Amino acid sequence: MTLLDLDPDQLLSTTRAVRKRLDFARPVPGPLIRDCVAMALQAPSGSNVVTMRFVVVQDAEKRRAIGEIYSEIYARYKASGSYPSRPTGDPERDRVQQRVASSADYLGAHIGEAPVLVLGCNEGSDRASALAGLGNILPAMWSFMLAARARGLGTAWTSMHRSREQEVADILGIPYDTVAQAVLTPVAYTKGTDFRPAARPDPDVVIHWDGW
């Protein structure tokens, strides 16, 4: 597999949440997902203990069932006060947020159509330890997404399915008492690979040197 010609800074700054540009019609080979997981496992983990787990969902019926749950949760989110298209009073910011909202709406309606869904999880000895160790899977999932981008795949970090985590666990046979789900992402080839850095604040706005 040929990797995209991206230097480290380009990879880090152009790995975006991809929604409307996911190619749902193109299958993603299992070995390619495995390669991304191999890279993800190089991420840091507490005490060098590998408790992160990746549930790769290729089965169409399971993807559809998870997609229905996600869509129902998203519909409630859209009706809430945290929906990203709420006016802010800043015209430029509002335009950006409208684009984000439109993109999120699309994923809310179509996530189950992605050729692959991946759930990043953490395994513990019981529910409490599984939740306490979620810090292991979070950097690993970001590494997974960087590896996917380098291979021409798109992802979108989501977690709202966790409000119905038990139902998703039941669909996939995930042992709820010992495995905590952290992240759900679609995985698909992207329509084009020309992604750009997002608008972000100047670093000096968010840096506090030697204290707050």
Model-derived features: where do they sit?
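Glycine-rich phosphate/pyrophosphate-binding beta-alpha loops
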Residues: 43-49
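C-terminal helix-cap and adjacent tail motif
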Residues: 2-4, 14-20, 180-212
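Short, surface-exposed beta-edge/turn micro-motifs
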Residues: 51-52, 114-117, 181-182
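Small-aliphatic-rich amphipathic alpha-helix that forms the alpha element of a beta-alpha
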Residues: 38-40, 116-171
